[in-house]
């Protein structure tokens, strides 16, 4: 309280001093104005009074400068004419600015800042323009982020016009790889062995059936998403589109679809087929490859496929009635309820559904041991009386042919498959269309595909497994 009282006392004394100075200056100003309006008294006098007249004029000018210093602003009619007066007024304004600066500095030291800053108010439109530009930039950034978030999983592209697709097409170049699976299913979703939670659905253009969106719930941080939609041409066909990579171990019931989608995605990412319309029939599974060069106007291969939004996509068609496709369908059914006599040992510690070129495998191929010993330790011996549709994969390397996990050869002649080591004496010869050399190399050099295939075989057999590995992984990598 004492400090406040002392400050109020100093403030009152300063105000009284300012008021007193103002009254004195006002009186001087009135006197000068009265003299300015009167006729000059020195004009009728002689030449001997010129010197005194000049002195009086200098005194008047000095008084005018004092007035200008106190008030700072005068009307044009009150300013004396002549270039000398204008120069003096400029000097007066500069002196006034210096004096005001000194006064403000002194008052700020005493805690009595009474000055008004005119600089911020000199051009208010400039500040408004800057604020408007900043607001416009923030709105543009938020709109761009909103568009990117809507297009991150293709939620909006199928329902838009072709003009919107033309604008979004450059962003599709960096989108993730998708694996679309077409299957005949009466249930709302296909039982792929994984755990999913539905978080939304949307009506797409040209399809009365809604498109449902699911996310993997095995791990909270799993980025894998799945889109499910019925085909508009055939309501019995369910189209499931997978996107992302699991970052957690998968249950054994999910490894069948994991191996199929992993192999398909690896083929696409390895560049086995550069044409967007190319298709390969691998044991009855119709692989349709579509790269980044998709044009927005033709949605040709599967019109209602959720993956037709510009993502690099592989389509696995399980709807055909090919006899060679039945083993894969039975494999899916068996994986949904795995046999009890298959040991879930540490031979396959990491079961990752890999949609990218990753070296994570479903089995441990390292460790310096023989892979066949690992199979024998995990599964024992295979039942020689059990005929599996995948027995053609177990083969020896023939002269002049490269190893193919699908039982095919890149050479023109038909391969010979020797099955003597599992009790079959005859040699089966069959003619199949050859695959591109790049596709064979991409498949054989992918350890995740080989390990996933071995795991699938062990579950299909339901018994002991013994595989004669005449071709090791290093030899497969060196093969043409």
UniProtKB/Swiss-Prot annotation:
<dbReference type="GO" id="GO:0003700">
    <property type="term" value="F:DNA-binding transcription factor activity"/>
</dbReference>
<comment type="function">
    <text>Transcription factor. Interacts specifically with the W box (5'-(T)TGAC[CT]-3'), a frequently occurring elicitor-responsive cis-acting element.</text>
</comment>
<keyword id="KW-0804">Transcription</keyword>
<dbReference type="Pfam" id="PF03106">
    <property type="entry name" value="WRKY"/>
</dbReference>
<feature type="region of interest" description="Disordered">
    <location>
        <begin position="30"/>
        <end position="108"/>
    </location>
</feature>
<dbReference type="GO" id="GO:0043565">
    <property type="term" value="F:sequence-specific DNA binding"/>
</dbReference>
<feature type="compositionally biased region" description="Basic and acidic residues">
    <location>
        <begin position="84"/>
        <end position="106"/>
    </location>
</feature>
<keyword id="KW-0238">DNA-binding</keyword>
<dbReference type="InterPro" id="IPR036576">
    <property type="entry name" value="WRKY_dom_sf"/>
</dbReference>
<dbReference type="GO" id="GO:0005634">
    <property type="term" value="C:nucleus"/>
</dbReference>
<keyword id="KW-0805">Transcription regulation</keyword>
<feature type="DNA-binding region" description="WRKY">
    <location>
        <begin position="185"/>
        <end position="251"/>
    </location>
</feature>
<dbReference type="InterPro" id="IPR003657">
    <property type="entry name" value="WRKY_dom"/>
</dbReference>
<protein>
    <recommendedName>
        <fullName>Probable WRKY transcription factor 61</fullName>
    </recommendedName>
</protein>
<feature type="compositionally biased region" description="Basic and acidic residues">
    <location>
        <begin position="57"/>
        <end position="66"/>
    </location>
</feature>
<keyword id="KW-0539">Nucleus</keyword>
<dbReference type="InterPro" id="IPR044810">
    <property type="entry name" value="WRKY_plant"/>
</dbReference>
């Amino acid at each position: 309280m004492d400090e406040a009282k002392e400050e109020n006392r100093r403030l009152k004394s300063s105000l009284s001093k300012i008021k007193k100075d103002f009254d004195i200056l006002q009186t001087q100003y009135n006197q000068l104005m009265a003299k300015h309006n009167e006729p000059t008294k020195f004009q009728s006098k002689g030449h001997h009074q010129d010197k005194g007249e000049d002195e009086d004029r200098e005194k008047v000018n000095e008084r005018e400068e004092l007035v200008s210093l106190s008030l700072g602003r005068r009307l044009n009619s009150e300013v004396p004419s002549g270039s000398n007066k204008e120069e003096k007024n400029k000097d007066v304004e500069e002196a006034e600015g210096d004096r005001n600066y000194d006064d403000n500095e002194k008052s700020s030291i005493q805690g009595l800042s009474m000055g008004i800053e005119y600089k911020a108010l000199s051009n208010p439109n400039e500040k408004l323009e800057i604020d408007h530009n900043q607001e416009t930039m923030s709105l543009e950034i938020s709109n761009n982020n909103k568009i990117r978030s809507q297009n991150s999983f293709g939620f909006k592209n199928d329902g838009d016009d072709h003009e919107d697709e033309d604008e979004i097409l450059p962003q599709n170049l960096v989108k993730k790889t998708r694996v679309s699976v077409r299957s005949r299913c009466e249930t709302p979703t296909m039982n792929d062995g994984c755990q999913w939670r539905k978080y939304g659905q949307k009506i797409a253009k040209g399809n009365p059936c809604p498109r449902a969106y699911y996310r993997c719930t095995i791990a909270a941080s799993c980025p894998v998403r799945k889109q499910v939609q019925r085909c508009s041409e055939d309501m019995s066909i369910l189209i499931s589109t997978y996107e992302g990579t699991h970052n957690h171990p998968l249950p054994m019931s999910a490894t069948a679809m994991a191996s199929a989608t992993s192999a398909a995605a690896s083929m696409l990412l390895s560049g086995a087929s550069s044409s967007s319309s190319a298709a390969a029939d691998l044991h009855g599974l119709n692989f349709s490859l579509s790269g980044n060069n998709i044009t927005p106007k033709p949605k040709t291969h599967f019109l209602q496929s959720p993956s037709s939004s510009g993502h690099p996509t592989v389509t696995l068609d399980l709807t055909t009635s090919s006899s060679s496709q039945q083993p894969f369908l039975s494999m899916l059914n068996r994986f949904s309820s795995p046999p009890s006599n298959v040991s879930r040992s540490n031979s396959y510690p990491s079961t990752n559904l890999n949609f990218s070129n990753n070296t994570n495998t479903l089995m441990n191929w390292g460790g310096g041991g023989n892979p066949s010993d690992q199979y024998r330790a995990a599964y024992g011996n295979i039942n020689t009386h059990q005929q599996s549709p995948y027995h053609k994969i177990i083969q020896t390397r023939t002269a002049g042919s490269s190893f193919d996990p699908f039982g095919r050869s890149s050479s023109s002649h038909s391969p010979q498959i020797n099955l003597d080591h599992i009790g079959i004496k005859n040699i089966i010869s069959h003619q199949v269309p050859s695959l591109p050399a790049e596709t064979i190399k991409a498949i054989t050099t992918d350890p995740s595909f080989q390990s996933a295939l071995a795991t699938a075989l062990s579950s299909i057999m339901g018994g002991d497994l013994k595989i004669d590995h005449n071709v090791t992984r290093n030899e497969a990598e060196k093969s043409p």
